[in-house]
Amino acid sequence: MRIGTFVLAMSLALSTTASLAKPVTLSGDALRQAISGKTVFLKISGFELPINYAANGRMSGKMSAVAASFARGDGAQDRGKWWVADDKLCQQWSSWMNGKSYCYRLSREGATVYWVRSDGRSGTARIG
């Protein structure tokens, strides 16, 4: 009985500790390492948009057929470039987002990445 009580108490303590964890801000080299050579799955309007961030600073994205139908003519796929500046992930697509460059502050909590764009727009993603 004491072992069962101990296990229950430890489970509650660990779950409480996990729920108190705060997102860790990704910056500088940690941000670069988290993104470089990885695929980030951006959650947009109920869909996941995979964006591949190559180590050479190039990136590519491809929407699913369903997501592309909602893209209002922006195209199902695009390429661009990415870089880290002032502890933010910056990127510029060839045609998506009208080819404008935007920078994002990223923080990570477990498998979830929270992003806030320079204009205040925010959302979530996961790194695969």
Model-derived features with residue positions:
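Bacterial N-terminal signal peptides
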Residues: 7-15
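Bacterial N-terminal signal peptides that target proteins for export
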Residues: 1-7
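Lipid interaction determinants
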Residues: 17-79, 88-128
